[in-house]
């Protein structure tokens, strides 16, 4: 990796290697950076990885963290080193990134109809590649290529997946009758349910389906309800693969409200930006916009006494009733929804608790 003028957030007109940059042990606030800048907190990343790894070990589960959150080789390496079974992907493009990094086990948690991608996937020497199907047409496209298929169970009004257990059973029978494919198990996503009671009902249906079909693998589990997934699926006579991915970055909004480990996970993503104007009493404008920080679930979280009231392409509106900030001040912002944070940055400094840059994350979205 080379750090130069193309690396957003870095003041590095003359190129240096990542190794040279890290050897300098730059400070976040005195080093060659410009604002806005997203950073990751090393202690929080490491803590979150350890916490989930311990949880899955303690409950006899396998973990295939969803790589879509970070698409970062350095973070994938942390997760795999902590014991992850493999990685989850949503698209063939993500699988291509994983393959280039040498990842040997992938769960493609999405239906696939792209014939060019199917042909490429069929040629890859994975230790294990699991793919989804929820219709006869999907099975037909996968036929004859050696794919191991998870039948996806959905629910009415939900996302993908067979709408009833009977549909899923019929699809399993079709897989058994089709040459060149193998029934690997069942899978689903509980996060489209309206509440925890709905999640529990759905997971009971998924477990019952898996038992009826003697499924070798059962998979579920985003980052919001993995406690319920553990309660309902742990201890099955099957390999249970859970897929939380957002946990590694956690946040100060959506997952702080929703995660069953909200009191134990730590926000690892911080965005720093500079006040560029205080044009009227009670208002400040920050050089931070939609290209820099997530805004799909919540607006960014400002320091105490300040509130983000609006976000534009390059500017953030702050309510500052106490007149706490002035132009030039650098502020820390928290995020909501890490899955739409990492994609905004190609290189992300990792800082220790003294705000020294100790690593660089690259992303491939």
Give the positions of each predicted feature.
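Active-site loop ensemble at the mouth of alpha/beta enzyme cores that anchors a bound cofactor
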Residues: 226-304
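A charged N-terminal "starter" segment
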Residues: 1-123, 361-365
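Active-site-proximal beta-alpha core segment in soluble small-molecule metabolic enzymes
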Residues: 64-195
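C-terminal accessory subdomain/extension
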Residues: 279-365
């Amino acid at each position: 990796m080379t750090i130069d003028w193309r690396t957003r957030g870095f003041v590095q007109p003359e190129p240096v290697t990542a190794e040279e940059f890290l050897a300098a042990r730059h400070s976040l606030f005195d080093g060659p950076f410009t604002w806005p800048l997203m950073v990751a907190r090393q202690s929080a990343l490491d803590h979150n990885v350890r916490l989930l790894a311990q949880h899955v070990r303690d409950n006899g589960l396998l973990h295939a963290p969803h790589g879509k959150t970070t698409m970062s080789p350095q973070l994938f390496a942390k997760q795999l080193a902590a014991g992850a079974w493999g990685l989850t992907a949503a698209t063939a493009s993500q699988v291509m990134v994983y393959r280039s990094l040498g990842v040997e086990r992938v769960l493609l948690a999405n239906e696939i109809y792209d014939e060019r991608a199917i042909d490429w996937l069929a040629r890859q020497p994975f230790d294990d590649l699991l793919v989804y199907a929820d219709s006869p047409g999907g099975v037909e496209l996968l036929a004859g290529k050696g794919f191991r298929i998870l039948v996806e169970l959905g629910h009415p009004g939900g996302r993908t997946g067979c709408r009833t257990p009977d549909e899923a059973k019929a699809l399993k029978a079709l897989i058994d009758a089709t040459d060149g494919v193998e029934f690997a198990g069942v899978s689903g996503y509980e996060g489209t349910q309206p509440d925890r009671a709905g999640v529990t009902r759905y997971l009971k249906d998924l477990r019952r389906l898996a038992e009826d079909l003697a499924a070798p693998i059962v998979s579920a589990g985003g980052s919001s309800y993995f406690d319920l997934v553990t309660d309902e699926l742990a201890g099955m006579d099957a390999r249970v693969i859970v897929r939380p991915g957002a946990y590694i970055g956690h946040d100060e909004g959506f997952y702080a409200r929703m995660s069953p480990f909200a009191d134990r996970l730590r926000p690892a993503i911080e965005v720093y930006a500079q006040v560029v104007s205080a044009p009227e009493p009670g208002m400040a404008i920050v050089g931070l916009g939609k290209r820099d920080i997530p805004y799909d679930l919540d607006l960014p979280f400002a320091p105490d006494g300040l509130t983000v009231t609006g976000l534009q392409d390059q500017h953030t509106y702050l309510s500052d009733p106490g007149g706490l900030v002035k132009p030039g001040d650098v502020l820390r912002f928290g995020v909501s929804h890490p899955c739409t944070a990492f994609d905004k940055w190609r290189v992300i400094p990792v800082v220790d608790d003294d705000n020294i840059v100790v690593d660089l994350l690259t992303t491939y979205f």
